[in-house]
Amino acid sequence: MKTERFWRFNKQDKIEIDESGLVKFLEQLGYASYYTMTNKTSEPLYVFRSGYIVEPIIPSRIHTDTIHALESGIIDEDILPPAIRNEVLSKLMGSKMILKKEVTLALKELDKPMKIDTKDCAYFFYRNNAVKVTRDKIQLLPTDQLDFYVWKSQIIDRNFELIDLETITTKSEYYKFLANVSMRPVSGKLENDLERLNNLLRLQGYLLHDYKDRANPRAVVLMDVSDKGEPAGRTGKGLIIDGISKLKKTIKEDGKSFKDDNRFKFSLVTIDSKVVYLDDVPAKFNFENFFSVISEGITVELKFVNKFYIPYD
């Protein structure tokens, strides 16, 4: 790897690190800053980019991964000979300069936006293709022509294969499962209910589409109902969420132990999370406390880490 030198020898023939040069080297490796607020009133998050794929990363990982990269000889030996490399490594590890805020805050922002679904289309990303989905068609996009970045967690770890509707409705185990849980009891027997099935499919489509209308914010509530019209468990909610999680990064919270007054209640949520699932909430769960989260956004606070905000859109 060719790079400008971010080290020099002082008058005492000791290695010194040039901070501005170090920042440029980190950027060359793929590190960047990412602001969740357009007005930049909070500190940025940090990311690592490789091609069109971006991954959230904490400063300690930037330090560790950079050290490992240098140890592996990522910089060409004609620029950084092995003997000098050891001195540079010792200086970086001893001073922990990579962790200094003056260094990380100087990292440039991403040069392209993150992928955002629009009202009329959604994007999905597989190992072999990007897929653009609209009401009328499914279009394959070459990834080398994308003009945006994508979170690493959004890459679905399999190849995309377009399957016709008849095959889905006759051979897909997941479709059969959805059809079964959509059945309704009639005179002691279960009968197919196309309306309930279509509603369940629309519900999943809503969760898989990142676009959200500020004028019409929604939350999805899944409740099992017995043949007596009463709530009942163990009839498929968890499997539906598992299905969603195969396509979108989903965070599961224990609904019974979830406390709204806990400042760290969303500590499992990350900047690339797409769905938050509260599992098995109590009967008297106060849903009104979620109105601001549903209509505005989520503030995530972790112990010993700066909190950050995920806006509604």
Language-model region placement:
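N-terminal nucleic-acid engagement/recognition segments and initiation subdomains in replication
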Residues: 1-172, 180, 184
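P-loop NTPase catalytic core of nucleic-acid-dependent motor ATPases
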Residues: 33-52, 56-60, 132-272
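Alpha-helical scaffold elements adjacent to nucleotide-binding pockets in ATP/GTP-utilizing enzyme cores
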Residues: 65, 239-243, 289-293
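Conserved catalytic/switch belt of AAA+ P-loop NTPases
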Residues: 249, 286-311
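Conserved catalytic network of the ASCE P-loop NTPase/AAA+ motor domain
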Residues: 267-271, 283-284, 309-313
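Hydrophobic "anchor" residues on beta-strands that sit immediately upstream
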Residues: 275
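Walker B catalytic acidic pair
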Residues: 278-281
